Swiss-Prot record:
Coiled coil: none annotated. This is 4-hydroxy-tetrahydrodipicolinate synthase. It is found in: Cytoplasm. GO terms for cellular component: cytosol. Homotetramer; dimer of dimers. It comes from Rhodospirillum centenum (strain ATCC 51521 / SW). InterPro entries: Aldolase_TIM (IPR013785), DapA (IPR005263), DapA-like (IPR002220), Schiff_base-form_aldolases_AS (IPR020625), Schiff_base-form_aldolases_CS (IPR020624).
Length: 291
């Protein structure tokens, strides 16, 4: 259903509010550069500091600008099941292709609680759901067994795997089968994830290098391993630079250097230090994205 380079979109801010024009232009640029899909209001989009009204507005803008040219997988997760249902219902009404639903954070549900959470969303809204498993932020790790149970539900179509465990996609593929869409949530290991059964990456780096990220994924898809490796190696310093500090600080700064938006964030997120800025700028230059 989904493949390739799918960008985890930043949310531009200006003067305390969402910079809608910058966001619209950014989505257009992503599509023009060859990005295969869009994820608004995920972790990188600072969804946790958006109001519900703002969250819905960003989804709506993304769907309107993309006009069906690429899939829109809207972030609709919450640690409240009812809230996740409400956001997912809005995403469907807005015309999103699917929903990206993060595992509930902070309240640490059991595996049975995770199953019940996703089943409730699945049963309430007729929209494809991609599970977002990111234990480093949510402090809960969905097991392969739980995911296999959920995969029996017709609208649970895949996972964004940000576990960092490169054995996981192989185990998941063996347990669930090749039709379950596995997308990497880690840029630095995206190509290794492909070799283990993945079909793409929901990428932070694609915010500032959409053409290169798409080219790398396309090279894999057509079996051009030499080109894939060349682009992978070119991107590696940038992958590192964008996570020297907590994302999305570095990637927003990088986007500001490219003239795509201001680097503004909302507290408790703060702009990166000068040392991080220097690393990010150097990586953009080395990758050929900045002179």
């Amino acid at each position: 259903m989904f493949r390739g380079s799918i960008v985890a979109l930043i949310t531009p801010f200006r003067n305390g509010g969402i910079d809608e024009r910058a966001f619209q232009d950014f989505v257009e640029w992503q599509i023009a550069e060859g990005t295969h899909g869009l994820v608004p209001v995920g972790t990188t989009g600072e969804s946790t500091t958006l109001s519900h009204e703002e969250h819905r507005r960003v989804i709506q803008l993304c769907v309107e600008v993309s006009r069906g040219r690429v899939p829109v997988i809207a972030g609709t997760g919450s640690n409240s099941t009812e809230e996740a249902i409400s956001l997912t219902r809005f995403a469907k009404e807005a015309g999103a292709t699917a929903a990206l639903v993060v595992t509930p954070y902070y309240n640490k549900p059991t595996q049975e609680g995770l199953y019940a959470h996703y089943k409730a969303i699945h049963d309430a809204v007729d929209l494809p759901i991609v599970i977002y498993n990111i234990p480093g932020r949510s402090v809960v790790d969905m097991s392969v067994a739980t995911m296999a149970r959920l995969a029996k539900l017709p609208n649970i179509v895949g996972v964004k795997d940000a576990t960092g465990d490169l054995v996981r996609p192989l185990r998941t593929r063996i347990e669930i089968g090749p039709d379950f869409c596995q997308l990497s949530g880690e840029d630095a290991t995206a190509t290794a994830f492909l070799a283990q059964g993945g079909v793409g990456c929901i990428s932070v780096t694609a915010n500032v290098a959409p053409g290169l990220c798409a080219r790398m994924q396309d090279a894999w898809a057509r079996g051009d391993l030499a080109e894939m490796a060349r682009v992978r190696d070119l991107l590696m310093p940038l992958h590192h630079a964008l996570f020297v500090e907590t994302s999305p600080g570095p990637v927003k700064y990088a986007a500001s250097l490219l003239g795509k938006c201001a680097e503004d964030m909302r507290l408790p997120m703060v702009p990166p230090t000068q040392a991080t800025r220097d690393v990010v700028r150097a990586a953009l230059v080395k990758t050929g994205l900045l002179t």
